[in-house]
Amino acid sequence: MIIVNNTLAFKLKNAPHKPGCYLWKDDAGQVLYVGKAKDIFKRVHHYFNPNRSFKTRALVERIADVEYVILKNENDALNLEAKLIKQYKPRFNLVLKENNGYLYFFITASVKPTLELGRRYEFSKNKYFGPFASSKFRLRDIYDLLLKLFPLRKCAPHERGHPCFYYQLKMCMGQCMGEDTPERYQTTVKGIEQFFNHGPEQVLNHLQQQEIKASEQQNFEAARHFLDLQKAVLELVNMQQTAFIKAKQSHDFIGYVFEKNVLAITVFAYVDNQLIGKNQQVFELPQDDEKEVESALVTFIYHYYSTNKIPKTLTVSLSEENLSLLANSLKINVTQPKNGEQKSILQTVIDNARYALNTKWTGFINNLNRAEVHQQLAQLLQVPSIQSLEIIDISFYDKDHVVGAMLRYENGKRMKALSRRYNINIDHKGDTNYMADVVYRRIISSIQTHKQLPLSDLLIVDGGIAQINTVTKVFASFPNVTQPIIIGLAKNTRHQTDHIVLTDNTTINIDKNTPLFAYLTTIQEEVDSFAKHNAFKRVSRARFQNPLLQIEGVGRKTVQILLDNFQTNAKHWSCFFERIITVYSC
């Protein structure tokens, strides 16, 4: 049974029967999920259905508050939802991966435009040509060729007044030296537009004339250069990806497959009936029914075309209501597959989506199973839930090279970006003192950056009651900090994970044949490996470090001065102190 607080219950009861957006928040005020709805009341209450999937329950159990934004219609809601997701990047939302679109050539919208190659599509700011599905390295060669054909500014404005690197290579028009004119520059810009919009005939004619002129002057090296440029231009034109040069029709097909809270989406882009590229992504979703999955797909499509070129026609299998919503929002023709050929293409796209889902299925299912193990652990410890846990371990080769390690898991998934390593340099030696130092620094960091990395629900220490008591004492010195559940993960005489130790020194034996035992063993091995790896790195650095750096007040710059004058460490020790002072003072 899901329990909600009084504030949330009141807001749910008074949710509006109007279109708009809703923002689920946790008890710290962080946005967990942003959604849109034709009827906000019906949508938000749907989340609290007791028969929802585990992924949905994982979201609902974190909800402590909700915020509504009432709008005129679903189009406005779709637009605002996209902006809110971009602003908050909620952990439960489907968020597009950065730099995962097609490549475009584009002319920047500046006083002195430049030719660039990139993925981000911002039609209102720049003039784009594409998309291209060729490899980035091949397009980079073509880009270099275009820069030779159309030598627009490449150097930064602050470099003007003296010849830039490209000027010396004769690859720019001399903007840095003030040798160009606005008229000449705009003519070059129009040449690029002519090349992409109307084909290369004008460029080829120009290169042929340059070749003939160079040959007549018996400058055969230059003539060969212009001939090579002609061949490169023809190669560019013959590439499949340049079909857009005289294109009249652009048509995208989007197919998707959804199974057990995993959504795989594939996009095929066609120009004049030629496939120019494929893009696919796989996501985990908290939604688990058809309407909500369609809503998530509509959100994806709207986001996708905010950074990619919008086709004239989009074919996707959706309800008439969502087709109409996308058509009105994107201002294009959005349809179901109409004939046998379109149905065949869409089925191929769906097959690609299914393959993408199957490829990543194991990883998603493992995370899902791990999340369920978190609930089993919560039941074992007799607490409502454990959404996040952190595990700490200490590793050292000797008393001078000690490293603490912390790994964080949320719903069973390791959050690699939140892993922490602690170099320990304290006077009081011993495992419990090292543990105290790590926990103290972890609490301090949580206070300073609570929103980025708050303390977890559960803290696991590698060890028994001695380590637990040490950690408890550290938390006692921070009365305003909420102490997480603390347990120890003890090992047997064969150094294998064996049982759980609680704060009152009672133990809980774990069935060795359960997923819970396998999970705890895995995370204990992962933190042990992480700690040892970082301890080894610290020792390795120390071995190759100049011993002079161990002297208090001596830094790398001072050591370099001494090395320049004495060359070997032996000479440092044999020379007179006064001589060292003289050298250092120079």
From Swiss-Prot:
Gene3D superfamilies: GIY-YIG endonuclease (3.40.1440.10), UvrC, RNAse H endonuclease domain (3.30.420.340). It comes from the Bacteria. This is UvrABC system protein C. Pfam families: GIY-YIG (PF01541), UvrC_RNaseH (PF22920), UvrC_RNaseH_dom (PF08459). HAMAP family: UvrC. It is found in: Cytoplasm. Residues 17-94 form the GIY-YIG domain. CDD domains: GIY-YIG_UvrC_Cho (cd10434). The lineage of its organism: Bacteria, Bacillati, Mycoplasmatota, Mycoplasmoidales, Mycoplasmoidaceae. One of its GO terms (cellular component) is cytoplasm. Belongs to the UvrC family. It comes from Mycoplasma pneumoniae (strain ATCC 29342 / M129 / Subtype 1). The UvrABC repair system catalyzes the recognition and processing of DNA lesions. UvrC both incises the 5' and 3' sides of the lesion. The N-terminal half is responsible for the 3' incision and the C-terminal half is responsible for the 5' incision. InterPro entries: GIY-YIG_endonuc, GIY-YIG_endonuc_sf, GIY-YIG_UvrC_Cho, UVR_dom, UvrABC_protein_C, UvrC, UvrC_RNase_H_dom, UvrC_RNase_H_dom_sf.
